[in-house]
């Protein structure tokens, strides 16, 4: 899988047996600023059970809270989440990251769960 960053928080990867962690993806320019912009890419091999979570900062950003702490909290929630129902997992992540505050920004969350070749 090929990934690029366009001004968003780092994607979080979960692999069976390898844990859950933010991926180091070189930052690119904010999406839509320059139609001719080049984006550095990162290659990630797909293995059965691979899960990738991508979000906008509206999901995790809280005034007065360090963004790295918010990313770490989301990583922890993803590490503990049940992956048998992605709809429920997404609901859990949205609730866990916003239950204590009023959101002031839009939220986008994408979760990919690779089950393997069929």
Language model feature labels by segment:
Residues 1-118:
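Conserved subregion of the PPM/PP2C metallophosphatase catalytic domain
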């Amino acid at each position: 899988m090929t990934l690029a960053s366009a001004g968003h928080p780092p994607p979080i990867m979960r692999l069976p047996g390898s844990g859950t962690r933010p991926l180091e993806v070189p930052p690119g320019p904010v999406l839509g600023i320059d139609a001719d912009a080049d984006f550095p890419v990162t290659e990630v091999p797909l293995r059965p059970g691979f899960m990738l979570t991508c979000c906008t900062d509206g999901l995790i950003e809280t005034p007065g809270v360090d963004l790295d702490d918010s990313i770490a909290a989301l990583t922890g929630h993803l590490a503990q989440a049940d992956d048998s129902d992605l709809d429920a997992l997404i609901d859990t992540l949205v609730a866990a990251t916003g239950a204590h505050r009023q959101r002031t920004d839009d939220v986008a969350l994408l979760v990919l769960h690779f089950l393997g070749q069929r």
